[in-house]
Amino acid sequence: MSAALGAVIGVLATLIVFTFVNRQKTFDGDYNRWRKLNLILQQIQENYVDTVDVKALTDAAVTAALGKLDPHSVYLPPVELEASETELSGNFEGIGIQFNVPNDTAIVLSVIPGGPSEKAGLQQGDRIIRVDSRDIAGQKTPQDSMVRLMKGPAGTKVTVTVDRAGEKIPFDITRDKIPVHCVDAAFMLDSTTGYIRLTKFTRTTYSEFISAAIKLKAQGMTHLIFDLRENTGGYLDQAYLLCNEFLEKGDKVVYMEGLHRSRSDLDADGRGSLKDIQLSVLIDEVSASSSEIFAGAMQDNDRGVIVGRRSFGKGLVQEPINFTDGSGVRLTVARFYTPSGRCIQKPYSDHYAYDIYERYTRGELTSADSIKVNTDEVYYTKSGRRVYGGGGIVPDVFVPMDTTRASNFYIQCNKKAVAMRFASAVFDRYRSELSQIEDFASLQSWMDSHKMDQQFLKYAAKQGLKPEPGEWEETSSYMMPQVNALVGRYSKLGEEAFYRLWIVVDKTVEEARKPHELF
């Protein structure tokens, strides 16, 4: 990219400084500055000594120009734009499975009900060995490459060959539109506390969320723990709709303003169905954009307790500009502001992309005292609590990243993905039993009766890994929930089982369940 741009600059200098016999060109100095780039590219195309890939050069120039604006104004080539839009659309076109690659073979974790793969006969636990004529098992094929092989336009066909209990079975599958769910998990933690995990703000976020919340409310939920950790955002309108469910009429949600965009305010209409629900919002250093709009609105209105670590700090609004060749630009046109008036966009810097790593090195992820706030940007919530702008949402209740749970045995097992491989082996051995488990209590009972901890230690030993004397007693307290969660994912309960078993050692959830009188 920089080399291509350097070539452009070099050609410009040559045109200006040197005089070529019979080839000298001059341009009226009164032309619009924005035409300069077009003129340069035109001269390169018409006069450069060698053949030039004009598209690549144009892409590089546009990318470099946008890079001078802000970190979130970007140019997206056709493939990247399609992937970005698919991620947020709430559906994609493919065969309708979720799979994992614990060794070098893709194993089907779940088959989407009613989807093409279920109709064709694929089952949970099938090992995918070939897609059309391409072998993918044992080939060290990257997981994203496997995804691309199986995705494709609705109506097109693909042959997926699987290994099922030693038998190789080909399935002819007609691709179709597949829904992508953004609510990963929704369940009751106890008789009054519900938990919802949202991974993205897509086109279907509001409908998925409100459906889950209503079901939990019917089960007795009076306190919701809403998990926005690792949620990088998405559509702003979906964040507004979620905020509206919790706020009173006239409460401020967010406003946007830019040099060429007049101020636009979004307020709650008071028609929300969750205004009586106690709320805890979980955030971390990856929570960004729409996640921060929601967390900021709840914090500034003193509507919910924000628990976790300082959020990412993206306070910019992008507008899509798409081109006929399938590429597009996401151009920052405004900043968004929380109800108290703060913009939570963190400063642009040369180290912007490494900000989270820098937070870790200076101790912010492990100590509340190390949180970096801009004391020049002080704002106040409805009840008069002090909050800060200019660098993400600072939680009301800080929960440090847990770095103490890292025994040598645990680290070595993670390096070799032993837990993931063990879960796959357990599924192979107990497939019929796991397929008959209908509820979470039965799953827990099944795991206890099958002594998962002892089986895991034996499996790890076969991989050449054994805990030191006395090491397992402490390590098991945080390692076995991870192992059990991976095994539970192979049951009918899927992602719900995974999160319910993992949450046992989740200190942020534990903190959110405690009473916090802040306002």
Per-region residue spans from a language model:
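Hydrophobic membrane-insertion alpha-helices, especially the h-region
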Residues: S2-T19
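Cleft-lining beta-strand/loop regions that shape enzyme active-site pockets
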Residues: V21-R33, L41, Q45-V49, D53-V54, ...
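Extended, small/polar residue-biased N-terminal targeting/export presequences
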Residues: Y31, E46-L109, G155-A185, L501-R513, ...
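Generic structural signal for buried aliphatic residues
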Residues: I128-I129, V158, I344, V387
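A sequence-level detector of short linear motifs
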Residues: A137, P170-D172, R330, Q345, ...
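Polar, glycine-rich mid-to-C-terminal structural blocks
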Residues: S290, D302, R309, G313-V373, ...
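Conserved functional hotspot residues or short segments at active or partner-binding sites
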Residues: C343-I344, Y348-F519
